[in-house]
Amino acid sequence: MTVIKIGGSVGINLDFICADVAALTKEGKQIIVMHGAGNEANALGDKLGHPAKHVTSPQGYTSRYTDRATLEIFVMAACGKINTFLVERLQKLGVNAIGLSGVDGRLLVGARKDAIRIVENGKQRILRDDYTGRVEKVNADLLRALLERGYVPVVAPLAISYQGDAINVDGDRAAAMIAGALGAEQLIILTNVPGLLRAFPDESSLIAHIDKQRVEASVDFAEGRMKKKVLGATEALALGVRQVIFADGRVEQPLRRAMEGKGTVID
């Protein structure tokens, strides 16, 4: 089984990815798709007069501050547009895809971070009324039931809190939790670069292989959102996933290329 995380950044080619998913499922491979929505949510927030606010933690990780209005915008982008049209693309290719968010059937459950600590202008401060969290439980039985019936789950990066609130979660880390819960052999994280770069944005500085014992040290090379991807890779490996690959989502046959070792392979 392979879990695929499609990044939400500009440049990723969904047609190439969906064509590859269709080809692989026809060969009998079990695939679960998790997708992001960052760029689409940013654009929608700008149109609605509520632009996204990205914040940085004291540890250097960037995330979206999600008040209730931002959560509503994110749901519109992630579930209303990206998830629906990803499923549409796959259905046109003969894949019986089914769209879900982590809220559906309590697929992804986690603790809501009502307040978050950020660094702003060199000083730490607390932001409250935040609707973000971290996935702690996966309804693996639901995903297995769908896979056994021939569906390809396409999951939007939302979860439900223990109190029943919808929460925005990091898609890379959520994909890692899904991969671990289902005993997936591979987690492929598709981005708008060839993989982890030693000197971003120089694409010729691609790091082709990282030993899984040294993956945490590779966060030093990660810039921006790539830091969360490295964290997700670390968590997936700790949960027993055999291999994590950061691969280029802009090219044709991105999944096959990743499976052939193109990108950054961590094992």
Region locations from a protein language model:
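C-terminal catalytic "cap/lid" subdomain
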Residues: M1-D267
